[in-house]
């Protein structure tokens, strides 16, 4: 059953590990777990600059992010878009 926008925002705000899919150098999909924060309608992803997912995003910023809850009531959201680097204060 589809979630309302309010339910979706609440779900994405509560869950902090997702699976990101990127495109590798051979043009194949590559998926990996990633930490994120949902803020103001956007997913902010956290990864190191030496990771394969970072290199893939630098070469091809098209990504898909899957967030799911694997216990009843099962829920999931898939976000497709373009990744871009954002500077943050730590």
List where the protein language model places each region.
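A short, Trp-centered hydrophobic/proline-enriched beta-strand micro-motif
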Residues: 12-24, 63-66
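Extreme N-terminal tail/first-helix region
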Residues: 1-17, 73, 88
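Active-site-adjacent beta-strand anchor residues
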Residues: 46-47
């Amino acid at each position: 059953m589809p979630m309302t926008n309010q339910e979706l925002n609440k779900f994405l705000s509560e869950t902090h590990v997702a699976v990101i899919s990127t495109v590798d150098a051979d043009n194949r999909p590559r998926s990996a777990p990633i930490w994120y924060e949902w803020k103001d309608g956007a997913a902010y992803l956290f990864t190191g600059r030496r990771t394969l997912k970072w290199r893939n995003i630098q070469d091809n910023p098209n990504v898909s992010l899957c967030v799911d809850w694997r216990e009843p009531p099962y829920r999931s959201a898939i976000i497709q878009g373009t990744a871009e680097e954002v500077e943050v204060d730590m």
